[in-house]
């Protein structure tokens, strides 16, 4: 008999804990959690497609997906890849599920999908639509799984050790796919590059202000402040620490702002010959004017605005999300975020209680990734020829 899973009627350990809340799960349901080989390539390179839920026709054939359904996609992929497939919900069900329920089911199946990645060890993972994106990233970000937010990125996922490409929902052309949607899917599949080496992003962190004596005319820096609140207008606020990454260096610097280094820092900020980048520059500009009595000269780029220009979907422009989709690193603010939060925009936070080493390392990473993001955004935006990014 096919019935919904009732956690009270099943012994502990019989199923994964997430099965209890999965709208697609039934005791005795057929599971398709083993990666399914759909195409053998001409080399050792591998690719895993995470698709939608299992269709009735595929299930009747004993497979998670029909080969002809994937054919248009396979024809667009380089022939060197051996291609595997797994549905974002690994249990088959005939129940009518809303889109929201499908996403919940995919979140519940997240560990199955991650296990499949570990088993296949692919060079690339393709995530078709929001449920597949949720399966991988739901527990790693608070930005949701809207495909419009994620598509267009080739994520060098440092946790999974492979490139991840989120895409729109896959509907074959003969199913009546919207021309623009199919065009964007085709464009995004060009991000699968067999010749691209998987990158790592490492930097030395120096928690001194030595960089202040090294900067000269012609340098380009990304910089960031850690402050006692969001806005500087109320009394009692100060710039607690600053971080600087000079483009091309192997070291990012992060240091407490003190009377001893304040004048040199102000000289650098006011210099038009030292070019400057920040993420949401209005924050650094506002705090500089309020605390130092000067404006910042030499601005050349705001990576927050750059992110908006590349993808204006709500939720895209935050630095931590940009770091995830561009450099594959999960949010590194966990150890400090409780100290940086204030109850109101004018309130004072608890930054003074934050462990200094953790705070300075956090700031260094912010400036480093901001610098890398500038280089990538400049390359992307310089190559654009039309309004949809093609």
Predicted regions and their residues:
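A polyanion-binding, active-site-adjacent surface
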Residues: 1-194
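Conserved RNase H-like, two-metal-ion catalytic cores of nucleic-acid enzymes
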Residues: 47-49, 56-72, 195-325
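Hydrophobic residues within well-ordered, non-membrane alpha-helices that form the packing/core
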Residues: 74, 117, 189, 269, ...
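Catalytic palm active-site di-aspartate
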Residues: 88-90, 302, 366, 370
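Hydrophobic faces of stable alpha-helices that mediate helix-helix packing
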Residues: 189, 278-281, 285, 316, ...
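Mixed-charge, glycine-rich, non-catalytic linkers/tails in nucleic-acid processing enzymes
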Residues: 197-199, 294-297, 337-390
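Proline-centered turn/helix-capping motifs that create local helix->coil transitions or kinks
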Residues: 328-337
């Amino acid at each position: 008999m096919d019935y919904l899973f009732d956690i009270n009627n099943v012994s502990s350990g019989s199923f994964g804990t997430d099965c209890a809340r999965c709208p697609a799960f039934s005791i005795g349901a057929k599971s398709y959690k083993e990666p399914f080989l759909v195409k053998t390539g001409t080399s050792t390179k591998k690719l895993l497609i995470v698709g939608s839920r299992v269709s009735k026709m595929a299930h009747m054939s004993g497979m998670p997906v029909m080969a002809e359904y994937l054919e248009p996609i396979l024809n667009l992929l380089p022939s060197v890849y051996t291609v595997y497939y797994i549905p974002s919900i690994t249990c088959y069900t005939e129940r009518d599920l809303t889109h929201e329920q499908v996403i919940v089911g995919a979140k519940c199946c997240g560990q199955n999908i991650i296990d499949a990645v570990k088993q296949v060890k692919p060079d690339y993972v393709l995530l078709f639509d929001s449920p597949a994106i949720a399966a991988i990233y739901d527990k790693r970000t608070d930005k949701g799984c809207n495909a419009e937010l994620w598509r267009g990125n080739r994520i060098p996922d440092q946790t999974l050790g492979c490139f991840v490409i989120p895409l729109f929902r896959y509907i074959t052309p003969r199913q009546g796919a919207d021309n623009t949607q199919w065009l964007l899917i085709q464009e995004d599949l060009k991000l699968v590059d067999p010749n691209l080496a998987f990158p790592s992003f490492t930097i030395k962190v120096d928690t001194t202000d030595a960089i202040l004596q090294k900067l000269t005319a012609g340098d380009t820096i990304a910089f960031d402040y850690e402050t006692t609140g969001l806005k500087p207008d109320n009394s009692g606020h100060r710039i607690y620490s600053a971080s600087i990454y000079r483009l091309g260096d192997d070291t990012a610097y992060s240091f407490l702002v003190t009377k001893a280094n304040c004048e040199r820092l102000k000289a650098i900020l006011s210099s038009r010959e030292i070019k400057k980048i920040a993420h949401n520059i209005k924050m650094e500009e506002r705090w500089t004017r309020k605390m130092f009595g000067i404006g910042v000269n030499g601005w050349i780029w705001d990576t927050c605005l750059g992110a908006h220009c590349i993808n204006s979907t709500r939720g895209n422009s935050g630095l931590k999300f940009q770091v995830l989709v561009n450099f594959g690193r999960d949010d590194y603010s966990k150890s400090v975020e409780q100290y940086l939060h204030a109850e109101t925009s004018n309130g004072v936070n608890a930054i003074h209680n934050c462990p200094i080493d953790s705070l300075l390392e956090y700031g260094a990473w912010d400036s480093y990734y901001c610098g890398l993001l500038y280089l990538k955004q400049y390359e992307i935006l310089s190559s654009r020829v039309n309004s949809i990014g093609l």
